[in-house]
């Protein structure tokens, strides 16, 4: 099954967020939230920069999104979500979570599964033209 190219495009934006975190002295984790193939929020890990243990990449992205309905949204995150972030994604009913890397940190895909939120890890092979 071919992976839609838009997933790679949005993951690249999440990677740019991770790079922004690195530039600020933080951890390299980024996220973007989309609806109708448009980015509606972005964020990166701010745990170190703001001395706040809950400001993971996904949480920063959700915070930027504000009090919207998360129905029909897709979260792209560079690293598999932790229990806190997976719980927030489940609570707000994000429709799909696309994960960039799930080997370094396996995360809590079981939480997403329990709440019926599909999670998909992008293949590590290079994007084909």
Where are these regions (language model features)?
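Short, basic/aromatic recognition patches
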Residues: 3-24
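Zn2+-dependent cytidine deaminase-like catalytic core
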Residues: 41-129
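A short, flexible N-terminal coil/short beta segment enriched in small residues
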Residues: 15, 21, 36-43
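Alpha-helix N-cap and coil->helix boundary residues
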Residues: 28-29, 107
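General secondary-structure propensity
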Residues: 2-4, 35, 115
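Small-residue (primarily alanine) positions within well-ordered alpha-helices
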Residues: 14, 18-21, 31, 57, ...
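Short secondary-structure junction motifs
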Residues: 24-28, 70-72
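Short beta-strand scaffold segments in enzyme catalytic cores
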Residues: 29-37
């Amino acid at each position: 099954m071919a992976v839609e190219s838009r997933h790679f495009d949005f993951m690249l934006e999440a990677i740019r967020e991770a790079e922004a975190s690195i530039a600020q002295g933080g951890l390299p984790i980024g996220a973007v939230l989309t609806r109708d193939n448009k980015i509606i929020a972005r964020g990166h890990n701010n745990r170190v920069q703001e001395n706040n243990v809950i400001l993971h990449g996904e949480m920063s992205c959700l915070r930027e999104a504000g009090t919207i309905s998360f129905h029909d949204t897709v979260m792209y995150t560079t690293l598999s979500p932790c229990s806190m972030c997976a719980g927030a994604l489940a609570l707000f009913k994000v429709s799909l979570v696309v994960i960039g890397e799930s080997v370094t940190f396996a995360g809590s895909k079981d939480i997403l599964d329990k709440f019926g939120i599909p999670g998909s890890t992008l293949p590590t092979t290079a994007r084909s033209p």
